[in-house]
């Protein structure tokens, strides 16, 4: 058997199986003719108010199917596909005090890529003490033969996907959100999770904020995490709500070059960047002298499936 020179992983999310009682936000938005997440936000709010314990086996089944798909494809470090989350970012926020999911606020997101009505920050943000990540991780790890990576949204990305009606102080809001992520991460560490990823796609869109206070937020997220846990930050340039959308407004991949030095100094182990959809100048990799790079080699927003030779050529094996 040939020796594998690279460890493989995925970023996180998978399409939800149709038998789940919740829907992917982008499918719901597409039904309304765009990327408006308001309907799925309201529907999930209603769902959690009356959800049944009998649904649990469906989420376990979905996680097992998604994990096995990855393992069968040769993925070394799978995720649970985020199958329990109606929205990757808002799912975390539902376990925080200070958020209002009933009275939504209209905002324009992602540099104008889309607009919608969002959950609002109405009071000081604090973790409510109930760690969702431990239950979700243990459930997924119990049906996986490989170590499961757990993913969480980063503070800056949460800020750009919610409506601040209280702080009017972006660094302060970022710090408070980072504290909530840190509480989940430390709970994951205690539960035995060895691969923890914080997603900050907004770093690529808001370079000044990322440099000014976003890096500090990431440091706070991973504060107190021991060395035997792999700490990861993911920075993509944005993905559309459906495949083959060539007009979606992505972040400028030059942002990677602008942030590389600061990211390289963070107390993390790995940085995840996309390439298949933006084709970086690969001199970028030389700027990450202290970090392992998770290199996005699959064009996941395209219906065209690459040949194996194309992937090997891209990563120069």
What does each of the following model-derived ranges do?
Residues 1-315:
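Domain-level signal for soluble alpha/beta catalytic cores
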């Amino acid at each position: 058997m040939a020796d594998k020179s690279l460890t493989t992983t995925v970023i996180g999310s998978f399409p939800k199986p149709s038998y789940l009682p919740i829907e992917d936000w982008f499918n719901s938005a597409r039904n309304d003719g765009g990327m408006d997440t308001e309907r799925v936000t309201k529907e999930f709010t209603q769902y959690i108010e009356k959800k049944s314990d009998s649904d649990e086996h469906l989420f376990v089944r979905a996680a097992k199917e998604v994990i096995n798909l990855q393992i069968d494809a040769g993925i070394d470090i799978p995720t649970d596909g985020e199958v329990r989350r109606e929205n990757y970012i808002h799912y975390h926020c539902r376990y925080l005090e200070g958020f209002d999911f009933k009275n939504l606020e209209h905002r324009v997101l992602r540099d104008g890529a889309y607009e919608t009505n969002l959950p609002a920050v109405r009071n000081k943000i604090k973790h409510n003490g109930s760690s969702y990540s431990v239950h979700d991780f243990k459930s997924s790890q119990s049906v996986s033969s490989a170590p499961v990576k757990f993913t969480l949204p980063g503070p800056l990305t949460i800020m750009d996907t919610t409506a601040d009606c209280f702080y009017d102080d972006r660094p302060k809001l970022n710090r408070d959100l980072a504290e909530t992520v840190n509480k989940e991460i430390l709970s994951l560490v205690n539960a035995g999770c060895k691969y923890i990823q914080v997603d900050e796609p907004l770093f690529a869109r808001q370079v000044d904020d990322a440099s000014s206070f976003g890096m500090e937020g990431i440091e706070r997220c991973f504060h107190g995490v021991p060395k035997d846990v792999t700490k990861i930050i993911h920075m993509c340039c944005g993905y559309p709500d459906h495949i083959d959308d060539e007009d979606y407004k992505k972040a400028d991949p030059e942002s990677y070059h602008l942030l590389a030095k600061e990211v390289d100094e963070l107390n993390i182990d790995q940085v995840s960047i996309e390439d298949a959809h933006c084709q970086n100048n690969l001199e970028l990799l030389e700027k990450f002298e202290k970090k392992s790079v998770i290199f996005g080699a699959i064009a996941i927003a395209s219906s065209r499936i690459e040949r194996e030779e194309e992937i090997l050529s891209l990563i120069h094996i």
